[in-house]
Structures are given as C-alpha cells and as structure tokens.
Amino acid sequence: EIVVNLPHELSGRLRMMLVNDFAKDLANQYGVAVDVAIHTPDAQGDNRNHHAHIMLTTRKLERLESGRVALTSKSQLEMSNTQLKERGLPSAREELKAIREQWANITNKHLKEAKIDARIDHRSHKDRGLELLPTKKLGWEASALERKGIKTATGDYNRKVEEYNHAMQQLAIIEKSLNAVTEQR
C-alpha cells in the first residue's frame, strides 16, 4: 500500500485525475494491478486532509495465451534486497525514493497545469539543505484528542518543532537581509 497526500488546492476531479495518472504509471512500471481509494477529510478533521490509498498486487499480472489474465511472479516491490541485487535492480529503499520522486513530479505537473503556484518536494528537509526539524505523524487517535482540546505528547512535540522551524525561517530572512545590506556597502 502507498498512501499519498493530495493537494487540497486541486478540485476533486483534478485530484482524481492526479491519482489515476500515478496509479497507471505504477501499473505499467511494475506490471501489477492497482486499486485506488480516495479519502476526503472528515467533518471534524483538517479540511485539507485529502489523501489516497493505493493498493498494488504483490504479483505481476500477465495475459495468458487463452486471453485470461493471471497473477504470476513476485513484482519488484515484493522482492527482498538480495533478490533485487541478484537481478541488478535498485534496493527497496532506493526504489521507495524513486517512487516518492515520481509522485512529486506528477503532482507538480498537475499543479502547474492547474495554474496553481504550489509545489511539493519528495526530499527530506536535511536533503534539501534546510535546517528545519520534521514533525511527527499525529495519527487519528491523537488528532481526535487534540480536536477536543486534549493535548498529546506528539501534539506538544509538533508544536515545539513548529515554533523552532518558524524561528529558524525568521532567522534565515534576517540573515539574508543583513547579507544584502553588507554586500551593498
């Protein structure tokens, strides 16, 4: 299963087109069947929480001489790193990074086509050279508690991280301004 966040800036129809394009790419790339379930935000949650669950078969689909379709050998996504290495294929970790990049590229293409000035990046803050800390996934149980005004350890952690990241972004703006003034002198 692959879970992807869908841009809330896109309409429902455009989000569906985005997920379907990605699912087709995965099906063609790995020779598997793909099923998609698009979820919209629940009434009590974050109204931007559009996401999709993408299920892939563990076996490849192949058309038999009879015309029927059958599940056959393991797909690349189900192979162990040893099996991948024997076949000269990237490791599971490398493949996951490639899938994340593929998702970012197709999402950014759809955002651009919709004339929306927003982009996503598949890389971590560290890999992007940003001195920002990542937040932790809150999960549905903690989200429900937080919505009721009950603070959770993960929620507290994320609030501290957001404060820190905001301070770091403000510091970067100040440093950039100071550098510009220094260069003018």
Describe each model-derived feature in a short phrase:
Residues 4, 38, 56:
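Glycine-rich, histidine-containing beta strand-loop boundary motifs that form or position
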Residues 1-3, 7, 24-25, 108, ...:
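Short, Lys/Arg-rich flexible segments
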Residues 1, 31-35, 49-53:
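Broad gene-expression machinery/nucleic-acid interaction feature
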Residues 8-38, 99-102, 106:
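A short, contiguous, amphipathic alpha-helix enriched in charged residues
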Residues 40-50, 57-185:
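Single-stranded nucleic-acid nicking/binding segments centered on His-rich, glycine/basic loops
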Residues 3-12, 85-92:
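Short histidine-centered catalytic/ligand-binding loop motif
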